[in-house]
């Protein structure tokens, strides 16, 4: 039981270890962050139009797992919030499942998740709902009833219509119109502010008409909705009651006041109209307007009509929001200042996206920029001759745009790539090699500026034209790596051999090519430096029999020293300018019947067929005795002539000597020939006798017998050679032993044949001569026929090898031996030393050398 528990515990620890290791090695998946402009990634900062239909695939979640495991995607929302999206867990495709309304919710927070088998990563991202023109202007104070005193002056504002469009941009701007001028001939409305006033020259008459009904139309600026341009409007009815005037402080009509300055406005434009009336409806007083504070000189107001006018250009305004205090003062008919009232008019400076990006040069707007520069500038260098500025006069996001350069290849790059309002444009070199004068002498690029976040996507283009100047960046190049030429021998000096051509794509002086030749075979040739024509030296004499092959190098070089090489092979073609010449030694021949004789002629021409010779017999008497081999020159008897008897039967000549006229003719064109007289003495072979002769004659019929005999002789010679070599080797080994001291015993000379001597001193009895028997190459022993032969000397051991083994130094000859050698050399022909003494000296020298050898080993 205890062992079972221990086994279970060990298994548990092992499983825990594997889980721990597996957990350590498993990494969590992650999303790709491709930025807000991408359609795949983690949905961060995704912009989605509110008019996107349900069921649209709006995005693709995209991520990966470091271990390569499959991942699943998910989308969740805050508890209780509406779920707008659904995601496919495997593909990551996100689908819109609910309608969007930016006015209700302009930002949706989403929890996107990515998970593998063990880990899950959740990220909170925001999806921004972009506006579409789907909202109508909504009146804030309509329909309404307005009381207007009948003594209200013409041009006075009587009401401010307010309508709000919850859309943004141009779709959220509101302009006002009266539906029909016939229904309200006495009134006019400001299109931007919505202020309704009495038309100039018109007045109200309480007695004639106490009520006026006006239909006001509010229209937005239009925008994109479901892919189409759409303008939306609303209408409402304003009822104007004309009342009699009464005595009361002024009352501003239509407060609060909001006015807008658009960038298209100019000085003098009416920005807003304030309107105040006297509270005394039955007997109202005159009201005058003034600006109390907050205008900063940028605005002015008409004191009677209340019209606020712009004094500056919108670009010169220092602020985006102005809060202006307007004062309305009652003036009595006598001109006395009475009661007054103040109100605040808020004026905002509104930017419209009505300016596309514009490129500027040094002298103003410009859409073509030209530059002249050398080819192959350094990579990373900016084009200094281009002074380009780009500007968008709009504000905020309306002035944000991208820069892009379009042209051949990726030679240039523009910096910066994203601009807000204004930037200096810099163009950098990215691919210097592509900017090649030889490929194109000018380059044209399009510089594009395209707005990013605006519906209009205004853009601008400018042409950049670069004129390239040539540099010496190319070496001359031959049309071929080698040239093969043939020229006949005996061509006169100055003859053209071959023309070489090298091209340098550079222009002007850089494209000028000069030619030269060099090399061991160029001695007899010249080249025209400008044309590349190779010709022979004026003194050159070409002879194919002397030299038929030449090769050398030709060099093409531009003015800066850039060059290339080509090899020229010149073959001197042979002309048939030598006739055949007979060998004088072959003109007298003795012919044995059955064996041919050969004559030979030599043609000194260098090439075939000029040096190929054909032999023929031109004349022979009689002409039916000889045949000649046309190729080899072998002359032989006719096959039927097999004995001297047949020869003598053919001719009356008893001396058997013929003179044959033979012609040697070459095969050149034109052909040369030479004739000569060949004297042929015909004889018959002497028959051989004996068994050996009989054997050889029989072997002619059976050559294998002859080959067997030759093989046997060779084997016997090899065997004898091995035996002799073995005997010599054994004798040398015995002679190399150290022998005891010897005494020379003088003996009387005995008559003995010279061949019985067993030492190297030999004496020829027929011819007196001296033999060099000094095995150490230092002592010469001379012997003559007179005086008489010396007695037998002791047998000398064989000499030491004349060369030491590899790696051993030679032993020097002892002094005694050297002294004897010196003396003996001086008397090479007169030797007075006794042969016995000479033998003793040689033995002494040998012992000394053997002793030295023993000491060394």
Curated annotation (Swiss-Prot):
GO biological process: cell adhesion; homophilic cell adhesion via plasma membrane adhesion molecules; retina layer formation
Record topology, Extracellular segments: 26-709
Membrane-crossing residue ranges in chain numbering: 710-730
Subcellular location field: Membrane
Cytoplasmic side: 731-857
GO-annotated molecular function: calcium ion binding
Disruption phenotype: Irregularly shaped Muller glia cells and disorganized retinal cell layers.
Function: Potential calcium-dependent cell-adhesion protein. Plays a role in the organization of retinal cell layers and Muller glia morphology.
Organism: Danio rerio
A single cellular component GO annotation: plasma membrane
Compositional bias per record (Basic and acidic residues), positions renumbered to this chain: 752-765
All copies of domain Cadherin, residue ranges: 40-139, 140-252, 253-359, 365-478, 479-582, 574-693
PANTHER family, A to Z: CADHERIN-RELATED FAMILY MEMBER 2, FAT ATYPICAL CADHERIN-RELATED
Annotated protein name in UniProt: Cadherin-related family member 1a
Signal peptide residues on this chain, from the entry's feature table: 1-25
Positions in coiled-coil regions: none
Organs and tissues of expression: Expressed in photoreceptor cells of the outer nuclear layer of the retina and in the pinal gland.
């Amino acid at each position: 039981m205890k062992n079972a528990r221990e086994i279970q515990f060990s298994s548990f620890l092992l499983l825990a270890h594997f889980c721990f290791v597996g957990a350590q090695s498993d990494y969590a998946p992650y999303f790709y962050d491709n930025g807000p402009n991408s359609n795949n990634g983690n949905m961060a900062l995704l912009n989605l139009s509110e008019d996107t239909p349900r069921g649209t695939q709006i995005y693709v979640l995209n991520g990966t797992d470091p271990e390569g495991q499959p991942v699943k995607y998910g989308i969740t929302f805050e508890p209780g919030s509406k779920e707008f999206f659904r995601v496919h867990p495997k593909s990551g495709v996100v689908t819109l499942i609910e309608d969007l309304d930016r006015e209700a919710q302009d930002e949706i927070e989403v929890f996107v998740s990515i998970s593998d088998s063990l880990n899950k990563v959740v990220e909170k991202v925001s999806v921004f709902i972009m506006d579409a023109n789907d909202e109508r202007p909504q009146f804030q104070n309509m329909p309404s009833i307005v009381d207007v005193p009948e003594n209200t002056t013409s041009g006075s504002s009587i009401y401010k219509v307010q309508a709000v469009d919850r859309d943004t941009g141009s779709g959220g701007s509101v302009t006002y119109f009266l539906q029909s001028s016939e229904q309200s001939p006495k009134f006019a409305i400001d299109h931007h502010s919505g202020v309704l006033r009495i038309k100039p020259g018109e007045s109200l008459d309480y007695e004639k008409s106490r009520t006026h009904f006006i239909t006001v139309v509010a229209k937005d600026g239009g925008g994109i909705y479901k892919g189409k341009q759409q303008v939306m409007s609303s209408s409402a009815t304003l009822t104007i009651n004309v009342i009699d005037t009464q005595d009361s402080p002024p009352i501003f009509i239509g407060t609060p006041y909001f006015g807008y300055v658009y960038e298209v406005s100019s000085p003098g434009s009416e920005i807003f109209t304030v309107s105040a009336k006297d509270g005394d409806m039955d007997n109202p007083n005159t009201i005058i307007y003034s600006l109390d504070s907050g205008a900063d000189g940028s605005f002015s107001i008409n004191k009677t009509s209340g019209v606020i006018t712009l004094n500056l250009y919108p670009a010169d305004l220092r602020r985006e929001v102005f809060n202006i205090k307007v004062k309305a003062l009652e003036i009595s008919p006598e001109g006395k200042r009475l009661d007054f009232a103040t109100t605040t008019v808020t004026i905002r400076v509104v930017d419209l996206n009505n300016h596309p990006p514009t490129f500027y040069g040094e002298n103003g707007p410009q859409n073509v920029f030209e530059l002249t520069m050398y080819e192959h500038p350094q990579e990373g260098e900016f084009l200094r001759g281009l002074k380009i500025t780009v500007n968008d006069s709009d504000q905020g996001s309306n002035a944000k745009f991208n820069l892009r350069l379009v042209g051949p290849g990726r030679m240039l790059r523009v910096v910066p790539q994203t601009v807000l309002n204004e930037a200096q444009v810099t163009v950098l070199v990215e691919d210097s090699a592509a900017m090649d004068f030889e490929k194109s002498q000018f380059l044209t690029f399009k510089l594009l500026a395209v707005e990013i976040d605006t519906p209009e996507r205004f853009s601008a283009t400018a042409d950049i034209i670069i004129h390239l100047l040539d540099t010496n960046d190319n070496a001359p190049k031959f049309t071929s790596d080698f040239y093969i030429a043939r020229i006949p021998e005996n061509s006169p000096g100055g003859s053209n051999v071959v023309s070489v051509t090298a091209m340098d794509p550079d222009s002007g002086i850089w494209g000028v090519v000069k030619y030269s030749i060099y090399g061991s075979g160029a001695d007899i040739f010249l080249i025209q430096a400008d044309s590349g024509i190779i010709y022979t030296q004026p003194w050159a004499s070409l002879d194919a029999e002397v030299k038929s092959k030449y090769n050398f190098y030709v060099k093409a070089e531009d003015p800066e020293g850039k060059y290339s090489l080509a090899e020229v092979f010149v073959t001197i073609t042979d002309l048939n300018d030598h006739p055949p010449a007979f060998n004088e030694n072959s003109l007298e021949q003795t012919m044995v019947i059955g064996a041919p004789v050969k004559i030979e002629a030599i043609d000194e021409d260098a090439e075939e067929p000029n040096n190929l010779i054909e032999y023929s017999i031109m004349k022979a008497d009689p002409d039916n005795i000889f045949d000649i081999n046309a190729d080899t020159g072998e002359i032989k008897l006719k096959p039927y002539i097999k004995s001297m008897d047949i020869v003598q039967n053919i001719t009356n000549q008893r001396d058997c000597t013929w003179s044959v006229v033979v012609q040697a003719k070459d095969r050149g064109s034109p052909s040369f020939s030479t004739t000569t007289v060949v004297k042929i003495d015909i004889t018959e072979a002497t028959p051989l006798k004996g068994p050996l002769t009989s054997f050889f004659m029989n072997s002619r019929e059976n050559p294998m017998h002859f080959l067997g005999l030759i093989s046997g002789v060779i084997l016997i010679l090899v065997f004898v050679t091995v035996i002799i070599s073995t005997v010599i080797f054994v004798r040398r080994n015995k002679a190399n032993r150290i022998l005891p001291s010897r005494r020379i015993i003088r003996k009387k000379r005995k008559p003995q044949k010279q061949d019985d001597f067993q030492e190297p001193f030999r004496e020829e009895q027929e011819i007196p001569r001296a033999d060099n028997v000094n095995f150490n190459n230092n002592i010469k022993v001379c012997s003559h026929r007179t005086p008489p032969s010396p007695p037998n000397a002791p047998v000398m051991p064989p000499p030491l090898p004349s060369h030491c083994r590899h790696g051993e130094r030679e032993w020097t000859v002892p002094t005694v031996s050297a002294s004897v050698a010196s003396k003996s050399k001086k008397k090479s022909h007169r030797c007075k030393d006794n042969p016995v003494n000479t033998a003793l000296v040689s033995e002494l020298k040998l012992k000394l050398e053997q002793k030295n050898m023993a000491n060394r080993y």
